[in-house]
């Protein structure tokens, strides 16, 4: 039995994924699912470059605005939600089009989840108590000794990921690296994968800087200030650690000037884009590459490739 078709449209931030997805929906019977760990949060619209109200009316996106910023969301949560939405779209006779830049989410969909143990509140409390004694940098050094590969990927200030990596080891006796190497259940779809990336990195850097300044003009500082004034959010939450938000939060706490926060936000966004491109360059599955500097040809190429694969869909 032939698997149903699904399409991945991947790419770094500011590469033009949303515009391309909107254009595709006018021509192909697709429904969009967001693959973005920042767009899930309500009230975080400007700094995440969330599609506008007009864009969402034209092309609705699923898995946008599903959580309050105080809530956490795991890769497992995403996989369950995405598979549910994909099944619903397929049942309507349409094609799921998954659009975004959170590469870990795509990997979880393709390969399934590795058998990581569930969280243990008691062990987490022990780790946090130890952090109060020696600091998260000290615990990061402990992780270096236990699981150097994971430690290399985790910032010494990233308390949540350090906690999780140590928790996994304390519960299972195996490192995060060992367990994530074990694949889970693969996705029950035939996947066409596209990646839209500018051929010149300097152009992407320029786009990122321009977009960040545009967000400032649209009221990004005020958006973060509203979150800050709630009183129940902090910089350790995944929502506030999103690029741009963390830097603006530091400004509101008086740690930096506004100009410095903007500069740091632009740098952090460029680093995110670099990581996303690195993920894509190392992707093991077959990818059709699109040039974001040539959106018209990218659009034509996607239409042509999908129609070639499934001529009888139209």
Swiss-Prot record:
One of its GO terms (biological process) is tRNA modification. One of its GO terms (molecular function) is tRNA dimethylallyltransferase activity. Residues 36-39, 160-164, 241-246, 274-281 are annotated as: Interaction with substrate tRNA. Keywords: ATP-binding, Magnesium, Nucleotide-binding, Transferase, tRNA processing. Substrate binds at residues 13-18. The record marks 102, 124 as: Interaction with substrate tRNA. Pfam families: IPPT. Its EC number is 2.5.1.75. Its cofactor is Mg(2+). Transmembrane segments: none annotated. It catalyses: adenosine(37) in tRNA + dimethylallyl diphosphate = N(6)-dimethylallyladenosine(37) in tRNA + diphosphate. InterPro entries: Dimethylallyltransferase (IPR039657), IPT (IPR018022), P-loop_NTPase (IPR027417). The keyword Oxidoreductase does not apply. ATP binds at residues 11-18. SUPFAM superfamilies: P-loop containing nucleoside triphosphate hydrolases. It is an enzyme of class 2 (transferase). It comes from the Bacteria. Belongs to the IPP transferase family. Monomer. Catalyzes the transfer of a dimethylallyl group onto the adenine at position 37 in tRNAs that read codons beginning with uridine, leading to the formation of N6-(dimethylallyl)adenosine (i(6)A). This is tRNA dimethylallyltransferase. It comes from Glaesserella parasuis serovar 5 (strain SH0165) (Haemophilus parasuis). The lineage of its organism: Bacteria, Pseudomonadati, Pseudomonadota, Gammaproteobacteria, Pasteurellales.
